[in-house]
From Swiss-Prot:
Record has Aminoacyl-tRNA synthetase as a keyword: no
NCBIfam families linked: PRK00010.1
Record protein name field: Large ribosomal subunit protein uL5
Record-linked Pfam families: Ribosomal_L5 (PF00281), Ribosomal_L5_C (PF00673)
PROSITE patterns hit by this protein: RIBOSOMAL_L5 (PS00358)
Keyword tRNA-binding: yes
């Protein structure tokens, strides 16, 4: 098991039970899944870009992504319904905990001029979304072999019922939030 899942089981559950006075351990919020989404809008002109994005996301996540398709046609963007426009991966279980551990301990410290994530990125139900500007912050990506720098969205889905519970869960797992001044 990943070391963060052990920390969650041994320390975080008890801390959150005391903080929110839950009656059962099953009420304590948990990370349900992590979704990595990479949109590749330039696939209209070059089909190879999507293959490179899939390869990057496979290296980052450790599993093969699915290709996302356009839900409707938009003439100004030159896309049609069903046209491939990106890729995404949903991580659960052991891979999710390993990715979350890698994200906190290796990837986030490699972001230039990083001062912490804003707490305003919660969605109202305890889920948190991050936008990563460049994929080269991940150690699996070789800078010399990428065709172009592209970003991705990372969504951490929790079983929390509110933003306060989600914030408490991620803070207890040492997620780097910005300190309000």
């Amino acid at each position: 098991m990943a070391k963060l899942s052990d920390i969650y089981q041994e320390q975080v559950i008890d801390k959150l039970i005391n903080q929110f006075s839950y009656k059962s351990r099953m009420q304590v919020p948990n990370i349900e899944k992590i979704i990595l989404n990479m949109g590749v809008g330039q696939t209209v002109t070059d089909k190879k870009l999507l293959d490179n994005a899939v390869a990057n996301l496979t290296a980052i996540s450790g599993q093969k992504p699915i290709i996302t398709k356009a839900r409707k046609s938009i003439a100004s963007f030159k896309i049609r319904h069903g046209y491939p426009i990106g890729c995404k991966v949903t991580l659960r279980g052991k891979r999710m905990w390993e990715f979350f551990d890698k994200l906190i301990s290796i990837v986030i410290p490699r972001i230039r001029d990083f001062r912490g994530f804003s707490i305003k990125s919660f969605d109202g139900r305890g889920n948190y979304s991050i936008g990563v500007v460049e994929q080269i912050i991940f150690p699996e990506i070789d800078y010399d072999k990428i065709d172009r720098v592209r970003g991705m969205n990372i969504t951490i889905t929790t079983t929390a019922n509110s933003n306060n519970e989600g914030y408490a869960l991620l803070s207890a797992l040492n997620f780097p939030f910005r300190k309000n001044k």
